[in-house]
Structure formats: structure tokens, C-alpha cells
């Protein structure tokens, strides 16, 4: 007989669950690790040239090109004439901004902050839309017409057949990497008020798929939804909104400050190559380039094709000073296998969540009530009486068996998995940096095996047919409690990242509904108890018959003779249907007749023997069985599975498969995609000083969610899979504990800076990172051999240490990269690199003039905060980024667009009593300490002065020999190390001043 392939037995459960997990996880991993293949043709979309775009990327990454480098200028001026239609190019060499530099953490009250002055060099390309006004409707300052020199996205829209419905502005942003300076400078450009939506192409990694990092609302996300290969989830958007991700992109300025609506499309891995010498075309792929380009073209086309009022009209927040681009709505979105894209409104999910919260418990309670009325609610029943008599003995039902197994198993297995995360953090915290799949495999195998062992062991000791339904009840309770928090977050915080829990609770409800409906197939509890009592009585009867001689009291009364007497016979006075029954009151000594036998007596002709008595007892059993079957419809030929409760034989054996389909595939897909995306995003952030525990906790929680759909069925999984996973756990645990965490493919990033004292010519080379690995880097450098290496905290990056040594063997030649510069002047000292002239312009006011050689960036650091700041040439303080702080500013970052140009900054400060003085000294007050002796008896009142330091940055390392310490590092550090800059400059030159 062929067994049901979907029955709830060990072999089918093991097969279907294992196949389902493998069929889902393998393609998800492949999609996560790969990129869509690049088209073989040169122009896969008419108007694009993938080959030319790849060559442009190769040119762009041929050298280091930060804002403060000569190669940046070279790239800005390069281009070729490839457009079919003229475009308007705004070569912005006039916009500048002075603003407050906010941080990801709100500053404490009365804490001095940081300000910046930046001169932009953005290039904006305006592509006229079909519905745009004709003519030059903008302010024509800084416009160069018909410079057709942009490629990629710009080239596509400049073709006549691809002209957008509404105009598009393509901004080639310069100065983004250091502090989003280019986007801030856009705020001063005349085109900015006309920009309603944006698509920001970003890079937080060096390849892979371009992820939809975050979006402002549902409507702009809909423009991305039809992309050929969508990739991303709303979780990233909410993580930014809640402050879990502190790094910023241009999105932060365009949306938060200017009020524009749009999207962030970004490369986000591998993080280890980001901002290193491997952040180039060689370590990228055409597939990555095509993935971003195709998504960009589709999204920009959809945004510019909206001719309605979706992105036009009054703002819903009523904010003044921001573009009027309509009323957005919050959205929830995620991709499926890199091909499908799900998008719906947050308010819709809130309504759905509220419905699930309220309706599902009521439905389940109603179903439970119906089961109770039908006397088939075996859950939570310990015993049942076979009758209504008080003296009836209650029979055990076993309805509580399996109730407490799931929470115990979940706590133990979850604790072991999270404990493994803490173990990794303690013993080998960076192993996830290069071996994230080994860590994930360890956690999956640990949770699976430990959870299975507890559930299988409990079911072996006390088999229960209610095991599955109890697990689903627990899942429903936990999911319902989680959904309460999710619903509050949806309504109050406008967060949609918890969509997975809404889907999970909905599927758990449907699965539990089916599980409760299964109970209708069971016999009534009272009927089952009556049957059990009858069977027990029969067993007791047979036990007595087999082990003791028959007595008259044990022998059932004889069955009446059914033979009828034919009419006209001797006993013809009886009807044919009337049995001949012996009258027990008759006299046994009746007078004999001539018919009386010679031997024997006048006994009843119906004789009782052992055989007839046995046949009569069997007949009684069959009669009772038929009566039980007729009363409930449940036969006696459905045996329970193994040693489960006797009443459970009628439970359907195939419904588990339907429940698994509801619980498994969709939840597994969402959990796997989300866990991989989050682990990919954070597993290499430990080198930046971020939490080393967080990646492991994310992996552990992702594993728990991934395997949770298996919980109701895991006790029927055979031992083969768990034992194999136990071996996997042992192997991966040993590897994760002892393996070296870095490799040439996943290099540890150390942060380099060389600090030069421009007054004493002393210089120190510093590497920032985790001390254990930084010391290994320093030990590999010839210039550090035999020198004292000081490692201490206080790094600009939290959680890292700074290891420094004397850089006398590798002095920088900071003018070598300049036009006509040779760097020979540095042999005589560094004093000529920066000239500072600080002079008083008032009692508490001063003018600081700075001239620096071969750099565009110099910073001011004051010992006490300044209450006023004005930079010559500035367009004024931009209050869109925050008002000037009452506590003042202690740091000012100054950026020029041209080399060797003078900065002039006027500053004011407050006296000891906290009042700013005017230009007249008569309004000042002084304490005794402000008097100093100028002669024998002459005293003069002196106002408080201002001390500070000018720090200039050099970032151009394209010419070998400019920064020998960096050249040495790139040549001699181990293959598992990548060197990148600590902050804005590779070399920092410091000069003090006082007024």
C-alpha cells in the first residue's frame, strides 16, 4: 500500500521542510551575492552606451579624486560631445554657504559646535521637458549653454525620442564625501527651488547590487517599483529615520533641509573596499553598473512622466522655505527574489494590523466555543467522565500534553544562539568581517539542533497529538503581543519596517484556524469516554474469563431460542415469532410420561455450553461497537500515531502541509532576505568603530525568525538532518573561534593621518583602529622599526585607538603635487606652507587671514568659542541648517574652490562675564586678573585675547612621493590590510595663533 506523501509522518515532514528551505535559501543567497548580468549589446536601451559608461567609470577611478585634489579638477573639466540635443549646463562657480554642521547626536545644551564655509563647484545639467516653459526662465548667472558633455543618465534623456515630460536636472555633485558639501551648496543655486523630486545615486560600498536605500514616501517609491531588478526594503529607510544609521547621504540635505521628495539608490557592499585603493572599476563589474543605470533610467522616467499634481501643490507639513511638492504618504515596500516588488501604504498596513489584532482572537474564541459545544474541545482538558453520574470515574484525556514545550525550547535554543553571538564577540569579534556565512551557518545549525532535540525528546517521552496546535497557539500569542507594539509604532512613529510580523501573525492565525478545525474530526469527549469504559469492561470480562473458571454468575443469560413452532404443531398456540422460554417457576420434578427419556430429566431443550456463551459475548461486543459508531460516526479502525492519545486517530494527517505552506515559504523568504541584507550592511562596520556585537545579534535574531515557521512540525523531523547540522555546528564553531578574521578579499581598514607641526617641523605618523591589528600594521613598516609607538584612546572615531610614531624617516613633500611644484622646499622646513595673520579689529573681535600652499581646506580651532563669524565672500549664514548656536562655535572649516586662495574670517567672542564687547573698550569690565604690570607702577587694562590653531589639510596622494608614509603603507602593510584616510586630510599641518 502506497503511503500518503503528505502525511504527518517523519519521512514526509523531513523531506518537504528540508526541500522548502533549500529551494528558498539557495536562490536568495545567489541573488544576494550576484548582480543581474549585464547585456551583451553595447546599447541595451536606446540612448545609452554601456561600454562608454564603463570606460567613464574606469577613468573616474584611475586616481584618487577627493575635492582637495588636482585630479578632481581634471575630471571636472573632462568630457565629450555625445548628445543629440542641446542641454543647458550650469557650471556653478559662485555658490557658497556658511552653515552649522549638525551631527547624528543632538549636542548637549550650551555646548560649542562646528561651523563650515564651503565654495561649491557643482555642475548642473538641465534637460528641458516637453511641458516646461520655453525660454530662459531661470536666473542666467553662471550658465554655459549647449555644453553637451554628460553621459549615462544625461545622455539618455538628451535624445529627442527620450525627452522627458517634465524637466530633469542632473547634478554632478562635488564635495559630497567629506560632509555633503555639494548638496548644501545646491541650496544657493537658482535652480534649487524648482526641483520637486530627486534620485540620489550613492555609494556606501564598492559593487554588488544597487539597493533602494531609503525613500521619502510611497509615491516616489512607486516610480522605482517597475525597475527590471528591484532590490531593497523599507527597513533601511526606517533605520535612518530612527537614527540607527548615523552616516548621511545627500538625501539628508535634499529632504530634511530643502524639503524635496526622492530616493536613495546606493551600492552598499562590500564595505571593506569602500574608500580604499580597491574602490575602483577593477573590483566592480558591469553587472553592478548596469543594475544601477537601468534602475535610474526607469525611476527618472517615471518621476518626470508624472504630469499630474502628485508632486505639485501645498505641503502637508506647511513648512515655509521648502518647495511646494504636494502631500506625500508613507509607504511600505520590499523586493522578492530581486524581481518582484511589493509596495503598499503604511495606513493600509495599520488598518490591516488593527484588524488582525481585534478580529483574529474573536474568531478563534468563537471557533473554540463551537468546539466546546460540540464536546470536541480536547485542548486544556485533563480528564472527562464517561457519564453524568457523580460517582463515575473520570478518564484521563491528556489534553495538556505538549503545552509547555515550545516556550521552553524557544528560550533554551534562543539563549544558546544569542550566547554564541556573545561568545564570538568575546573570543574572535571580527570573524564575521570575512566569514559571515560561516557565522550564519553556525547559528542556524545550533538553533535547529537544540530546538529539535528538546521538541523531539519531549514528544518521545510524552507523545501528544496536540503538540502542533499548542505550538501554533504560542506562536499566535507571541505574534499578537509583538503586533501590539508594531501597530503602535505604525501609528505613532510612522514605521513600516515591522511588516514581517504583520505577515507572520496573519499566517499563524490561518494555520491555527486550520488546526482548530481539525478537532471537529475527533469523537465527542463523552462518547469517547463511554467507549473507553465499555472497552475496559470487556477487557475486564475477558481477563476474568481467561484466568478463572466460569460460574453461573459470570455466564451471561442464554439468548432466547429464535426457532418458531410451525402452526398446527404441539405448540401451535405460540406465534411464529414467540420464542419458547422455559418458565423458571415450573416444577423440576414434573411427572414423567411415556416420552420421558430413560436417562436425564425433563430439562430445557435449549442447552447452554462454553461455545455458545463465547459466541454470545462476541455478539454483545459487536452490538455495543455498532451502537457507539451510530451515535458519533467514528469507527474503531483509526489507530493513533505511535503512542499518542487514544482519541487522536481520526485527526487528518495531511493538513500539516497546508499549515506549513501558510507559515513557511513567505516568512522564510522575508526573514532570509532581511537577515542577509542587514548582515551585509553591518558585518564590516566594526573597523569604523561601530559595535562589534551588533552584527552577531542581528544574525542571531534573523536565524530565530528564519526557523520559527518550522517550530510546529520539527518534532516529526527525522534525526538525519539535525545530526548533520550538529556536525556543521561543531565545524563552524571551531573555525569561527580560531580562524584569522581578515583576508585579501575582506581587508581590515586602518585609518591613516600624518600630523605636521608647521612651527617645529616635527611630524608624527598615526594609524587608527583596533590596537591588536594596528600594532601588526605598524610592525610591518620599515620607518617604524626601532621607534617608540604610542597607542592611546582619543581617536576621532569612537571605539578606536591611535598608534603614533615619529615620522622623521618619511617627511611629506606637500607641494610635489602642485603645478610646477617639486616639494624641495619641505627639506628646509614646513613653515612656508601656511601663513597666518591674526589681528584685533575690536576689543573682542579679530580678523584671521590664512594663505596655504597647495590645498583648498584649512580649519580653525579656537580655545574658547566665538560668538560671531563672518567669512569674506560668503553669502551669509544659512539658517536652514540651524541658527548660530548661543554657546558659540569652537571649530570652523574653511573650503575654497581654487588653490592657494586667501581666507579672511572675522570673529567675535565674549568676555569672562559672557557679554560680547563692542568696538569701544569703554563698555568692557575687567577682573583683578586682567591687570598686568607694564612698568614699576604703571598698570594697563588688557582685554581678553583669543587663542587658536589653524589646521590645513592635504589630500592629494596621486603623485608618488608626495606622502611617503602613505606610499610605504600601501607597499608594506599585510595583504589583509587596507589603508584609508582618517578625516578630510591625509596630512594635517598645524600652526598656532593668538590675538
Swiss-Prot record:
It is a multi-pass membrane protein. Residues 32-349, 424-437, 490-499, 672-693, 743-995 are vacuolar. It is found in: Vacuole membrane. Binds 2 Zn(2+) ions per subunit. GO terms for biological process: proteolysis. May be involved in vacuolar sorting and osmoregulation. This is Vacuolar membrane protease. It comes from Chaetomium globosum (strain ATCC 6205 / CBS 148.51 / DSM 1962 / NBRC 6347 / NRRL 1970).
Amino acid at each position: 500500500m502506497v503511503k500518503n506523501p503528505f502525511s504527518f509522518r517523519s519521512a514526509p515532514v523531513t523531506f518537504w521542510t528540508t526541500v522548502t528551505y533549500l529551494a528558498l535559501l539557495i536562490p536568495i543567497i545567489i541573488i544576494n551575492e550576484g548582480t543581474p548580468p549585464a547585456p551583451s549589446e553595447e546599447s541595451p536601451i536606446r540612448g545609452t552606451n554601456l561600454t562608454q559608461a564603463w570606460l567613464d567609470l574606469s577613468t573616474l577611478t584611475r586616481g584618487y579624486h577627493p575635492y582637495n585634489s588636482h585630479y578632481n579638477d581634471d575630471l571636472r573639466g573632462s568630457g565629450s560631445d555625445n548628445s543629440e540635443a542641446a542641454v543647458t549646463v550650469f557650471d556653478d562657480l559662485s555658490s557658497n554657504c556658511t552653515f552649522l554642521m549638525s551631527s547624528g547626536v543632538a549636542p548637549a545644551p550650551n555646548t560649542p559646535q562646528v561651523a563650515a564655509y564651503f565654495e561649491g563647484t557643482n555642475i548642473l545639467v538641465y534637460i528641458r521637458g516637453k511641458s516646461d516653459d520655453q525660454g530662459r526662465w531661470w536666473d542666467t548667472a553662471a550658465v554655459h549653454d549647449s555644453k553637451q558633455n554628460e553621459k549615462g543618465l544625461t545622455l539618455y534623456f538628451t535624445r529627442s525620442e527620450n525627452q522627458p515630460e517634465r524637466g530633469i536636472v542632473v547634478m554632478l555633485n562635488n564635495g559630497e564625501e567629506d560632509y555633503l558639501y555639494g548638496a548644501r551648496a545646491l541650496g544657493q543655486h537658482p535652480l534649487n527651488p524648482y526641483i520637486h523630486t530627486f534620485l540620489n545615486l550613492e555609494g556606501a560600498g564598492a559593487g554588488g547590487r544597487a539597493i533602494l536605500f531609503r525613500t521619502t514616501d510611497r509615491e516616489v517609491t512607486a516610480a522605482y517599483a517597475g525597475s527590471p531588478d528591484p532590490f531593497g526594503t523599507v527597513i533601511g529607510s526606517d533605520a535612518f529615520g530612527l537614527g540607527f544609521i548615523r552616516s548621511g547621504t545627500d538625501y539628508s540635505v535634499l529632504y530634511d533641509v530643502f524639503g524635496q521628495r526622492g530616493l536613495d539608490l546606493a551600492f552598499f557592499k562590500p564595505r571593506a573596499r569602500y574608500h580604499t585603493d580597491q574602490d575602483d572599476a577593477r573590483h566592480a563589474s558591469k553587472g553592478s553598473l548596469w543594475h544601477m543605470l537601468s534602475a535610474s533610467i526607469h525611476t527618472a522616467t517615471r518621476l518626470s512622466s508624472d504630469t499630474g499634481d502628485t508632486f505639485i501643490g501645498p505641503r502637508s507639513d506647511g513648512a515655509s522655505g521648502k518647495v511646494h511638492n504636494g502631500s506625500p504618504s508613507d509607504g511600505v515596500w520590499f523586493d522578492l527574489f530581486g524581481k518582484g516588488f511589493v509596495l503598499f501604504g503604511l495606513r493600509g498596513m495599520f488598518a490591516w494590523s488593527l484588524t488582525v489584532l481585534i478580529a483574529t482572537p474573536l474568531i478563534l474564541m468563537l471557533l473554540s466555543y463551537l468546539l466546546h459545544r460540540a464536546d470536541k474541545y480536547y485542548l486544556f482538558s485533563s480528564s472527562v467522565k464517561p457519564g453524568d453520574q457523580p460517582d463515575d470515574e473520570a478518564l484521563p484525556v491528556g489534553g495538556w500534553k505538549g503545552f509547555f514545550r515550545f516556550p521552553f525550547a524557544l528560550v533554551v535554543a534562543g539563549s544558546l544562539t544569542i550566547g554564541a553571538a556573545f561568545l564570538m564577540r568575546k573570543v574572535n569579534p571580527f570573524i564575521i568581517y570575512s566569514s559571515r556565512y560561516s557565522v550564519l551557518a553556525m547559528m542556524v545549525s545550533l538553533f535547529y539542533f537544540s530546538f529539535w532535540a528538546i521538541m523531539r525528546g519531549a514528544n518521545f517521552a510524552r507523545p501528544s497529538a496536540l503538540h502542533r496546535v499548542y505550538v501554533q497557539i504560542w506562536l499566535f500569542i507571541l505574534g499578537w503581543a509583538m503586533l501590539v507594539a508594531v501597530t503602535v509604532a505604525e501609528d505613532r512613529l510612522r514605521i513600516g519596517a515591522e511588516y514581517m510580523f504583520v505577515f507572520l501573525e496573519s499566517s499563524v492565525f490561518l494555520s491555527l484556524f486550520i488546526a482548530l478545525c481539525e478537532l471537529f474530526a475527533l469523537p465527542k469527549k463523552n462518547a469517547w469516554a463511554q467507549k473507553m469504559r465499555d472497552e475496559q469492561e470487556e477487557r475486564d470480562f475477558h481477563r476474568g474469563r481467561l484466568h478463572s473458571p466460569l460460574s453461573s454468575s459470570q455466564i451471561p443469560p442464554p439468548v432466547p431460542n429464535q426457532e418458531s413452532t410451525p402452526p398446527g404443531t404441539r405448540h401451535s398456540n405460540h406465534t411464529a415469532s414467540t420464542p419458547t422460554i422455559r418458565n423458571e417457576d415450573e416444577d423440576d420434578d414434573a411427572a414423567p410420561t411415556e416420552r420421558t427419556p430413560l436417562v436425564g430429566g425433563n430439562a430445557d431443550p435449549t442447552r447452554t455450553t462454553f461455545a455458545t456463551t463465547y459466541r454470545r459475548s462476541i455478539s454483545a461486543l459487536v452490538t455495543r461497537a455498532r451502537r457507539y459508531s451510530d451515535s458519533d460516526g467514528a469507527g474503531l479502525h483509526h489507530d493513533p500515531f505511535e503512542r499518542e492519545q487514544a482519541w487522536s486517530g481520526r485527526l487528518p494527517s495531511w493538513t500539516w502541509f497546508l499549515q506549513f505552506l501558510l507559515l513557511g515559504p513567505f516568512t522564510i523568504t522575508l526573514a532570509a532576505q532581511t537577515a542577509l541584507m542587514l548582515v551585509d550592511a553591518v558585518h564590516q562596520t566594526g573597523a569604523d568603530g561601530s559595535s562589534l556585537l551588533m552584527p552577531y545579534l542581528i544574525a542571531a535574531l534573523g536565524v530565530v525568525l528564519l526557523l520559527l515557521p518550522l517550530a510546529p512540525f520539527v518534532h516529526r523531523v527525522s534525526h538525519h538532518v539535525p545530526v548533520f547540522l550538529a556536525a556543521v555546528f561543531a565545524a563552524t564553531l571551531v573555525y569561527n573561534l580560531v580562524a584569522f578574521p581578515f583576508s585579501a578579499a575582506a581587508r581590515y581598514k586602518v585609518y591613516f593621518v600624518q600630523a605636521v607641526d608647521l612651527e617645529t617641523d616635527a611630524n608624527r605618523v598615526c594609524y587608527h583602529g583596533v590596537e591588536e591589528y594596528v600594532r601588526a600594521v605598524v610592525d610591518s613598516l620599515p620607518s617604524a622599526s626601532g621607534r617608540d609607538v604610542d597607542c592611546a584612546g582619543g581617536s576621532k572615531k569612537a571605539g578606536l585607538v591611535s598608534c603614533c610614531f615619529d615620522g622623521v624617516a618619511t617627511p611629506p613633500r606637500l607641494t610635489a603635487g602642485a603645478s610646477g611644484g617639486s616639494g624641495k622646499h619641505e627639506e628646509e622646513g614646513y613653515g612656508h606652507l601656511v601663513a597666518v595673520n591674526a589681528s584685533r579689529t575690536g576689543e573682542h573681535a579679530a580678523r584671521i587671514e590664512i594663505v596655504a600652499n597647495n590645498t583648498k581646506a584649512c580649519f580653525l580651532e579656537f580655545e574658547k568659542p566665538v560668538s560671531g563669524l563672518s567669512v569674506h565672500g560668503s553669502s551669509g549664514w544659512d539658517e536652514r541648517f540651524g541658527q548660530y548656536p548661543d554657546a558659540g562655535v569652537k571649530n570652523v572649516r574653511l573650503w575654497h574652490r581654487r588653490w592657494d586662495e586667501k581666507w579672511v574670517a572675522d570673529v567675535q567672542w565674549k568676555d569672562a562675564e559672557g557679554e560680547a564687547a563692542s568696538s569701544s573698550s569703554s563698555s568692557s569690565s575687567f577682573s583683578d586678573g586682567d591687570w598686568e604690570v607694564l612698568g614699576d607702577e604703571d598698570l594697563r587694562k588688557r582685554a581678553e585675547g583669543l587663542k587658536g590653531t589653524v589646521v590645513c589639510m592635504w589630500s592629494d596622494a596621486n603623485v608618488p612621493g608626495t606622502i611617503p608614509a602613505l606610499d610605504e603603507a600601501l607597499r608594506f602593510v599585510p595583504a589583509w590590510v587596507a589603508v584609508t584616510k582618517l578625516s578630510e586630510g591625509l596630512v594635517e599641518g598645524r600652526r598656532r595663533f593668538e590675538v
